[in-house]
Amino acid sequence: PQSPPPPHPRDLTNRIRRQRDWCLRESAIGENRGIVLGVPFIEFLAPGLISMQIIQQSFAHSSSSILSGKMMGNIVDLVGSPLSALEVTLAVIFASITRSIMISFLSILVFSIFIDIRLENALFFVVFLFLSSFSMGAMGFIAGMWSDKWENMATVTNFIIVPMSFLSGTFYSINRLPEILQKISLINPFFHMIDGLRFSFIGSSDGSIKFGLIYLFLFSLIVWFISFFLYKKGYKIRN
């Protein structure tokens, strides 16, 4: 089997364009959508779309990097290099973070042309951007190690990553959900990624920002340790 062609810059442009079109459509009916968390719905929506791209892009980068190496056979060069498991896992994850940073700033730039989007707290933005990208990069690393072919990766993306990012408050406030679903949302790491990043833009949130920071920090450590352990043991790559 052959790996797909490398990502083309046009792919990133298309993703940004889709987000822009989303915002334009919602702007057209924005007056009818009311106020969410103290801001117009369109200003509530934009940070959610940016957050969703950060989540999906950081996961896609690390997962495709590992799986491409496995399928093309050049991962043996990485395994046989003098780099430690710590160095390899962090290198792949930080590459995912770099991609997420580029996507986030491009998205903010495009959205600022069409809507009033402001960054209320730059420190929280940087912290949540880092934690979200780091944890999703580590999850992508794990998925890449586990997958044997692109169909396996598509299954993870389509049935886990995309649904969890959509069902984590991207398009709505969880206060509108039944109480049991609100409690379920609070244990979903994707919710805290989106909620924290949205807080940095609009200054209000659905959940506790302090709890979200601690939760994502611990979650990042856990998924990084799993990725480190799998690579160190040579899971599905030693053969």
Language model regions located:
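Single conserved hydrophobic/aromatic residue that forms the stacking wall/gate
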Residues: 1-26
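Transmembrane helix-boundary elements of multi-pass transport/secretion proteins
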Residues: 18, 25-69, 117-125, 155, ...
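Short amphipathic alpha-helical coupling elements at transmembrane boundaries
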Residues: 68, 73-80, 148, 158, ...
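Membrane-interfacial helix-loop-helix junctions in multi-pass membrane proteins
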Residues: 115, 165-222
